[in-house]
């Protein structure tokens, strides 16, 4: 039996990844396809312990306090454990997996800790580590949900009802988020991701409009 397909929904915080991934998985299931939705980090698993320590500031108050290679390893191990225990067999048996974040998040959030001239080397290392050395499957397609930074910040503030203390070390650092957006734009352009522009005239497009575009991209990939 041929292996399955892996479609990734990527984007910065506040871009609506979880909503769009869930809607896409439901749509594909309703069309008769064998589909599973996964989310990273896998906070329900013990494998995310180092990720939680990192994001809660136990290794430093700023994202840059943890170098990108160490931080990437935290997330990679979490993905490996998830693959081995939750979705690997399903994927290997031909199922369609919809991922809310994946290896692509390391590309976005950890590249941003480095000067741009080092991005290509880091990306080669990150993907070689996860796909070749760890044996995780590479995605068949990545959909990048692009959101204007001001809109993203407003959405995140609303998520926590104005309580800034609930934000993790990434979400609290505006300058870091700006760098991550630049890294995301670079990755989308150079790694062949499909970009969905989620904001229009300073506001989010409707969930339904965005989902229609996401579905069209998924159908094009799945055939």
Q: At which residue positions do the language-model features occur?
A:
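Pre-Walker A (Motif I) flank of P-loop NTPase domains
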Residues: 2-6
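Hydrophobic anchor at the beta1->P-loop junction of P-loop NTPases
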Residues: 9
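P-loop (Walker A) phosphate-binding loop of NTP-binding proteins
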Residues: 12
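Conserved lysine of the Walker
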Residues: 17
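Hydrophobic positions on the alpha1 helix immediately C-terminal to the Walker A/P-loop
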Residues: 20
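NTP-dependent small-molecule kinase module
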Residues: 25, 150-223
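ATP-dependent small-molecule kinase phosphotransfer cores
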Residues: 31-128, 132-134
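A glycine- and Lys/Arg-enriched "phosphate-lid" helix/loop adjacent to the NTP-binding pocket
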Residues: 104-182
């Amino acid at each position: 039996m041929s292996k399955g397909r892996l479609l990734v929904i990527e984007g910065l915080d506040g871009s609506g990844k979880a909503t769009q991934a869930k809607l896409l998985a439901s749509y594909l299931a309703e069309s008769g396809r064998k589909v599973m939705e996964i989310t990273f980090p896998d906070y329900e698993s013990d494998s995310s312990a180092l990720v939680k320590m990192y994001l809660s500031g136990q290794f430093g108050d700023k994202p840059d306090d943890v170098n990108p290679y160490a931080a990437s390893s935290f997330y990679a191990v979490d993905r490996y454990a998830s693959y081995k225990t939750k979705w690997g067999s399903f994927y290997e048996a031909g199922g369609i997996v919809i991922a809310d974040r994946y290896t692509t998040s390391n590309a976005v959030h950890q590249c941003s800790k480095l000067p741009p001239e080092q991005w290509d080397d880091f990306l080669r290392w990150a993907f070689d580590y996860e796909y070749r050395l760890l044996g995780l499957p590479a995605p068949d397609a990545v959909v990048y949900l692009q959101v204007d930074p001001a809109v993203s910040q407003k959405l995140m503030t609303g998520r926590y009802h104005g309580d800034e203390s609930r934000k993790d070390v990434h979400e609290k650092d505006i300058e870091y988020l700006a760098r991550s957006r630049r890294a995301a734009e670079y990755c989308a352009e150079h790694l062949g991701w499909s970009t969905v522009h989620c904001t229009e005239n300073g506001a989010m497009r409707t969930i339904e409009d965005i989902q229609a575009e996401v579905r069209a991209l998924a159908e094009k990939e799945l055939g």
